[in-house]
Regions:
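Amphipathic, hydrophobic secondary-structure cores in small proteins
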Residues: 27-30, 65, 91
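Small beta-barrel nucleic-acid-binding modules, principally OB-folds
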Residues: 60-78
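Catalytic strand-loop segment that frames the active site of acyl-thioester-processing enzymes
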Residues: 2-48, 52
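A broad, structural micro-motif
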Residues: 33, 64-66, 110
Length: 143
């Protein structure tokens, strides 16, 4: 994945933000926040974003499954300062949607992630429910 477009690095464009306390255990031998710890922070924020959208584990008879996650590490993050993960829906398709996330510390971009989520029923992709599509669009990236 190439470095994200500069417009995607503006926290004001994201409708959801979640602050995470960093832990000493998140630090690696290079004295910065470990890449695996950053991925876990993105995961935590993505789940909280889904909950904020009102989509717990099930969406009616459908479930949402993560199909892919791609992450770019943009700069170093450091303990003990907290990080903020900003989340938005980037795209809504027929049976899937894309969530983008910006992890920042002191307003400085540290990491960017793009995740594809798929609506699943009977272990197969299924169209996004009609009443859920407006919810996804409401949480879209701001212009």
């Amino acid at each position: 994945m190439a470095r994200p477009d500069a417009a995607l690095l503006d926290p004001a464009r994201y409708p959801f933000a979640h602050q995470i306390t960093t832990r000493f255990a998140d630090v690696d031998p290079n004295q910065h926040l470990n890449n695996v710890a950053l991925a876990a922070m993105m995961e935590d924020a993505r789940v909280r974003f889904n909950l904020a959208m009102g989509s717990a584990v099930k969406i009616g008879e459908r479930r949402a499954m993560v199909a892919s996650v791609a992450m770019e590490y943009l700069s170093q993050g450091h303990f003990p300062d907290p990080v903020t993960v900003h989340c938005a829906v980037e795209r809504v398709g027929n049976s899937s949607w894309t969530v983008i996330q910006l992890l920042a510390q002191h307003g400085r971009p540290v990491a960017f992630a793009r995740s594809a989520l798929v609506a699943i029923a009977d272990d197969r992709p299924t169209p996004i429910a009609g009443d859920y599509r407006p919810v996804l669009e409401q949480w879209s990236l701001r212009a």
